[in-house]
Amino acid sequence: MDSTTLQQLEEILEQKIPPIGPKGHNIGVWYPRKEREVFKDLCYSATKLLLPLYPIYIPSKGRFKSRLTSRVLERLGVPYYMVVEPQEYEDYARVIDPAKILKLPFSNLGQGSIPARNWIFRHSLEKGHAKHWILDDNIRYLLRRNNGVKVRCETVNVFRAAEDYAARYENVAMAGFNYQQFAINYEIVPPVRLNTRVYSCILVDNLLAAQVLDNGQLWRGKYNEDTDLSLRCLKAGLCTLLFNAFLIMKGATMKMKGGNTEEVYENGAKRKDFAESLAQQHPDVTKVVQRFSRWHHQVDYRPFAGNALIPCPSIVPSTPNNYAMFLDELTPQRYKEMLCRDGCK
């Protein structure tokens, strides 16, 4: 668009159009102009509880004191399994109902969460589940993004909404919630992004994911396991869904005790290994770059843009469904609970 046309468009819209960024991104504008609303004193609640259709697993290590994701799910009243190594079972059982804890048959393998993730996959298959959720253990709270604004979400109904959306299509191998920092308020962000990486809060289709097993294992390697699995599914012609309508706020992996920090991210030198491992697994779409004095992997997802969703017949509803969610008052007590940090009571 030339400068004259841009100026004419800005006059019609009665607002400035932000310049396009270095990656071709544009934050966009709202027309009519959207006034910035403040929702800091509100949260999403629900008039009724809609539990997830599929089990939620949380592989965890060394975080029985913080147990952030567990706290969130407890507060929202949703069942889950905390998956732990045997030497830490008693620590977790002192703070979590033992009926919610699954004890792994191994410990300290030095492979991060990979063995636990593969055990979880097999467990869900043995229990006859078509899909399962697998969540990182450092999720602080959930959010819903609607009309360009993120609001904290105090209902588990977003899991059911995501499940139902994924069920509209026959070939969605992975779906999940994006990180809240990647869906900025008032920027033009699609509610769902197709065919990209999904991590930290994932709904896995067991049957479809089984198409990409490597030596009988779903998860592999030591680093970047979520991105690796996303790429393997995409290379198999399957699709992934990343929700911007539903988001998670996480604690920083490197700043929290426990988890895979000691086994996988134990020092800065590991950063290059972390980046190079994905480039070795997927050299056709990955390169290693240095940003902000740290090594990163950079993945090109454009080759998978042609992976088309296959709709299931007669499954898309004809009317909107808010899954019983509504904007509610965010009380000081609720706010305190949502921001509960490591070791809080």
Task: Locate the predicted segments by residue.
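Active-site-proximal specificity loops/subdomain of glycosyltransferases
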Residues: V84-L135, R140-E154
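A structural signal for short, well-ordered beta-strand segments and their strand-loop junctions
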Residues: M82, K131-L135, A173-N178, T240-N244, ...
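Short, aromatic/basic amphipathic alpha-helical patches
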Residues: T69-R75, D91-P98, P190, F274, ...
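Short, polar loop motifs at secondary-structure junctions
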Residues: G62-R63, V84-E90, L207-L208
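Short, acidic, metal-binding catalytic loop of nucleotide-sugar glycosyltransferases
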Residues: S45-L51, R63-Y80, V95
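C-terminal catalytic/acceptor-binding lobe
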Residues: M1-P55, R63-K65, R220-K345
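Short, hydrophobic beta-strand segments that form beta-sheet elements in well-ordered domains
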Residues: I56-S60, P79-P86
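Conserved catalytic core of nucleotide-sugar-dependent glycosyltransferases
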Residues: Y141-L231, K235
